[in-house]
Design a protein with these regions (language model features):
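Ubiquitin-like/PB1-type beta-grasp interaction modules and other compact soluble beta-rich domains
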Residues: 1-91
């Protein structure tokens, strides 16, 4: 099934603005992120901790609705879903 991935800020520099990913039925948010990390070591280094878990500061949205990166990674994805990936936001 096809899902769209949109990347922002430093993740955009690594992955590009957006990409369509063909993933197996039943894939979860985490399995998609790991798939992206497998093909992009720079993304994996930025998004995942040394122990392999997603860094808690990574912001995720599915279909423009924010999800909790610590508790919602097992959400199954559906055909046509859009996953947005944001790095931490800082400012002053």
């Amino acid at each position: 099934m096809l899902v769209k991935v949109r990347a922002f800020a430093q993740f955009r520099e690594i992955l590009g603005k957006e990409m369509d990913m063909n993933i197996p039925e039943g894939s979860t948010v985490l399995s998609l992120l790991k798939s992206i990390g497998a093909s992009s070591p720079a993304f994996r280094e930025q998004a995942f901790s040394g122990s392999g878990g997603l860094n808690d500061y990574v912001l995720l949205m599915i279909n423009k609705k924010r999800i909790d990166p610590l508790n919602d990674l097992s959400i199954p994805l559906n055909e046509g879903d859009e996953l947005a990936i944001f790095p931490p936001v800082a400012g002053g």
